[in-house]
Amino acid sequence: MLRLTQRRTLTLQAPEIPGGEPHVSAASGLVRTGHQVHVVADDSLHLATFALEGNTPGTLLRLLPGELPLDAKARKALKPDLEALCLLRDLPGAPHGALLAVPSGSTAVRMKGALVPLAEDGRPTGQVREVDFTDLYAQLARELGPLNVEGAALAGTRLRLLNRGNGDVGADAVVDLDGGRVLRALEAGEALQPDVVRTVRRWDLGKAGNVRLSFTDAAPLPDGRIVFTATAEDTRDSYSDGAVMGSAVGVLAPDGTPMFLDGVDQKVKLEGVDARVERGRIHLLLVADADDPAVAAPLFETVLEGVPA
């Protein structure tokens, strides 16, 4: 079992909207660049950036237009549900890389993501572009049924998406997209099309208690493997929240086959992961969704023992 150590909570300099809480609660995607970490939340229109060291409150960068209501039920119905954050390295228009915020696709209003170019120091530049996933997700829904995309990572020439199969009819799946085609579409400002899909494979990750574990995020390793998080949430569908029975961390082989899975020592809803190899070991940063807007999401760290770096 992996031992989680809390590094900080995701407090903000100011709330996203007047009357809101000055923190990120529903943390759902995580990427480290330079001396900062970037987080998307599934109930937010912004990217949050935090210093890697210390507890200095984070800052916000708008990703999508509009405003979300404070009322939890109304907010849930209108939110863009940004569930994954992916670091891209080979965009001609972003020489220092870019962040791709990926929506879940679980409802018709959850089809728009965002592309954020990075500066040399890894900070977002503010030159944000909207990315339309509608046509791509329509194709994936025809193959998988209800969508709930929660992980994205660039692995070699493929952009790998992880579909969360929580609920009665959802399917956990590894979806490989043609990375070159995706990057060209992003560079041209075009919507992502069905022709970027290469393979779609379903997987069963097992259970925590009597509840099925389902993918919640992904992070690449240098050799093409991908670290993923998974959570067992007792819910009937991809829209509703439920009791969290446990979370786990795993590894996908370069071909997308699950090759390692281990639980964590706290009953938290892990939703975001960043992985890097340091001193011959795989070090992880992780965020959890508090599922309570009054509670700040935690940032954890751990070392992935038992897996060669």
Where do the language-model regions lie?
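Sequence/structural signature of beta-propeller domains
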Residues: M1-A309
